[in-house]
Amino acid sequence: MSRVCELTGAKANNGMAVSHSHIRTKKLQQVNLQKRRLWWEEGKKWVNIKISTKALKSVQKVGLDKFAKSNGVDLKKF
């Protein structure tokens, strides 16, 4: 199961963990993904999506259909 947002394509970021003594080690910063069942008004059906919490906040503000179109995602495949 890949940890990629199905609406935005957001995926893990490579970062550094820095200790108190300033020793740096590589760290993988994962996306906060949630499995959500969202109502798609235009298609008149429920859509099951793995979505990041940042994208979920935008969907609640703008709407699922408008947000998906702005990101070039076809909701018919879900």
From Swiss-Prot:
Matching InterPro entries: Ribosomal_bL28, Ribosomal_bL28/bL31-like_sf, Ribosomal_bL28_bact-type, Ribosomal_bL28_sf
Pfam families membership: Ribosomal_L28
Keyword entries, A-Z: Ribonucleoprotein, Ribosomal protein
Disulfide bond positions: none
SUPFAM superfamilies: L28p-like (SSF143800)
GO MF annotation: an example: structural constituent of ribosome
UniProt-listed GO biological process terms: translation
Signal sequence bounds: none
GO CC terms in record: ribonucleoprotein complex; ribosome
Family: Belongs to the bacterial ribosomal protein bL28 family.
Name under which the protein is recorded: Large ribosomal subunit protein bL28
